[in-house]
Design a protein with these regions (language model features):
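Bacterial N-terminal signal peptides that target proteins for export
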Residues: 1-7
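PEST-like low-complexity, intrinsically disordered acidic/proline/serine-rich tracts
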Residues: 6, 12-328
């Protein structure tokens, strides 16, 4: 039987099988079964920086400088295959540093060390958690299994920094984003249709998009509050609103930002920012994701006493603010 410390370590380090696809940093290789085709030389990307804060500052300055290609209805054309270069799913405040990932395998990943915070606001790169939420975050990491171990959906914004690649499809009335992670997809309505009923709570919420010049602004509500934003137990409730901004900086670069606003958990909204880059591998395509096949992680984690995360609703918060950390 593992000690409590061992259980916590297991919760941090045990990854679902599909995460292996993201462990070998080969451009255009979305999964173990994929065989990459010939790859063009990597193009330069506007505002490219290892520091998310510097990238985000530059992206704001250049947001209107590029004349993006247009769709038939005159909107910026984001269609194509895209990827990110962040390990924020591990820890928003200190993601693993991709620059140090020179070899394949989990041992090399563990050696990589922390990178710079993906949080670009507040400027200190820290989560503005309320005191009770700091306690809850530590308890989440120690007691609960990340939703991805069960192949559950990741929620927004984590959907945008999970393993694998993305495909963006545009139509006049909507934008669809397909993810290799768990066969997930989002359909973002841009035609002004009304929102779904407030009592409907979904893993990826209810998204509505609008255009502000060349920037696609997406506001997502109605999430179910059952996801972690990273594998360190960062969370929000079902009352959260997430506002994303997609801005094309050049033909091969999108500046992506997401502001999380949940006044039940945080003292103020916070914003993450990073770069999406276009896949340039010839013949690249989204492949089927092997998620649960052969997955022993959940069995192991349950055997050492960890639990499935129950989520936190707005109705739960008053009691959680006054309870002791182990009373759930």
């Amino acid at each position: 039987m593992l000690s409590v410390a061992g259980a916590v370590a297991a919760a941090v380090l045990v990854l679902p099988p599909r995460a292996v696809a993201d462990q070998v940093p080969q451009v255009g290789t979305p999964g173990a079964a994929a065989t990459p085709g010939p790859q063009a030389s990597e193009p330069e990307h506007s505002c490219a920086s290892d520091d998310p804060a510097l990238f985000w500052r530059c992206a704001q300055e250049k947001a209107t400088a590029f004349e993006a290609p247009r769709t038939a209805d005159g909107r910026p054309d984001f269609s194509g295959y895209w990827r990110h270069g962040t390990e924020a799913k591990e820890d928003l405040e200190a993601p693993w540093d991709n620059r140090a990932r020179v070899g394949a395998g989990r041992e090399r990943e563990r050696d990589a060390g922390p990178g710079k915070s993906l949080i670009v606001d507040p400027p200190d790169g820290k989560l503005p958690l309320q005191p009770w939420a700091e306690v809850q975050k530590r308890e989440n990491e120690a007691r609960y299994i990340d939703q991805n171990t069960h192949c559950f959906l990741s929620g927004v914004p984590r959907f945008m920094y999970e393993a694998g690649a993305y495909q963006i499809l545009q139509a006049p009335e909507s934008i669809t984003i397909l993810s290799e992670e768990a066969h997930a997809f989002r359909v973002i309505a841009t035609d002004g249709r009304p929102r779904i009923a407030k009592n409907l709570r979904l893993w990826l919420g209810d998204a509505r998009g609008r255009w502000e010049g060349n920037t696609l602004v997406v506001e997502t509500t109605n999430q179910n509050g059952r996801v972690f934003l990273d594998r360190r137990g960062t969370f929000y409730t079902d009352a959260a609103t997430v506002t994303e901004r997609f801005t094309m900086l050049d033909q091969n670069t999108i500046a992506y930002g997401a502001t999380v606003d949940d006044p039940l958990v945080y003292t103020r909204p916070f914003t993450i920012g990073f770069m999406l880059t276009r896949h340039t591998t010839k013949g690249f395509e989204i492949l089927e994701d092997s998620c649960f096949e052969g997955n022993k992680d959940a069995e192991i984690l349950y055997s050492i006493g960890l639990k499935k995360y129950p989520g936190i609703t707005s109705e739960d918060v008053p009691a959680l603010k006054v309870r002791t950390p182990t009373s759930r």
